[in-house]
């Protein structure tokens, strides 16, 4: 997997890459939207707790396929409240630890549960060999 930012496009406005090249044969994991819910179904109380829970959930999904955060090729982050962006980005950076997948950020009017503040879906890729 190779991250790149073409010279003919303005540089990234955050911690992401404009493109991710994945060569075959690769194993792919398409992660459904993860939210800030623990294994008992309890929703985190605030954006910080929900963000940490969802990144732990992503780690668990990836581990189920023998992958890790650095295998994420693309992610989409959905936020309900614009004022939560700073905390959500800070925690995202903590978990990505310098990894720069292709990324999209969306602000939405709401998510599937009225108490959810954030959701992240992703695609991960790892060599089959």
Which residues does each PLM region occupy?
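N-terminal presequence-like segments and the immediate start of the first folded domain
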Residues: 1-56, 60-73, 79-129
């Amino acid at each position: 997997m190779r991250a790149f930012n073409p010279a003919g496009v303005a540089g990234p406005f955050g911690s992401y890459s404009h493109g991710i090249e994945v060569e075959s044969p690769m194993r792919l994991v398409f992660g459904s939207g993860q939210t800030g819910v623990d294994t008992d179904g309890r929703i985190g109380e605030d954006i910080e707790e929900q963000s940490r829970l969802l990144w732990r959930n992503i780690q668990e999904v990836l581990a189920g396929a023998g992958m890790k955060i650095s295998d994420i090729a693309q992610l989409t982050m959905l936020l309900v409240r614009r004022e939560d962006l700073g905390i959500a980005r800070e925690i995202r950076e903590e978990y990505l630890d310098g990894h720069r997948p292709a990324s999209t950020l969306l602000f939405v009017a709401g998510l599937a549960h009225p108490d959810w503040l954030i959701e992240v879906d992703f695609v991960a890729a790892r060599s089959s060999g």
